[in-house]
Amino acid sequence: MRTWEERMPRTALELIPLTVATQRDAIVAGAVDIALVRQPIDREGLQLIPLYDEVPVVVMAADSTLSAADELDAADLAGEVLIASRDDVLGYTAPGTTTPAFEALETTADAVATVAAGVGIAVMPMSLARLHHRKDVTYRVLRDGPVSSIALAWDADRATPLVDAFVGIVRGRTANSSR
C-alpha cells in the first residue's frame, strides 16, 4: 500500500472485502480491478500470480486445555467439537472430532463467537483468526493442517495501466524498471 501511495499519489487504492464465494464473480463482473484471492479458483479468463500459503490455526476458547501447547497436530484435536461455518475456506475435518448438534453457522465471525462460548474449536487460516480475534479466544498453529494458497488475480481481458502498475509493485519492480 505504501509503495502504491508513493508511486501513484493521485490514485486511491480501495480495499473491498470479498468472500471466497464471490471473489471470482467480483473480478469477472468488473466490481474490482484486481483481487487477493484464495485458491482454488476457476482460472478461466483470469491472470493469477501465486503469492503465499497461509498457515492453518486452531481457534479455541482462551481457557481451553489445548492452549497449553505452542502448536497442535490433528491428533491433539480428538474428542473436540469441530465447528464450521458456511463460509469456511478450508473444509477441514480431523479424525476423532465430532460435529456440533447444530447446523453450520453462517459466518466465520459466528464460528469464533461460538468457540468463545466454549462449545468447541474451529480451524481456519491465520489471517481469519487474526481478523476475528477476541479477548476470549486464542489460536495455535495446526502443523499438519491444510494451507490456504493466496494469489493475486485479475481479468485477463481487462488489464489496465493501473492494474499493470499494481502487478509490477507486487512483483517487486522499481519505479524506473519496465516489463
Say what each PLM segment does.
Residues 19, 73, 106-107, 125:
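Short loop/turn segments at beta->alpha junctions
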Residues 67-106, 112-113, 160:
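Secondary-structure junction motif
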Residues 1-14, 31, 168-179:
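N-terminal hydrophobic or amphipathic helices and topogenic motifs
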Residues 39-40, 62, 86, 125-128, ...:
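Short secondary-structure boundary segments
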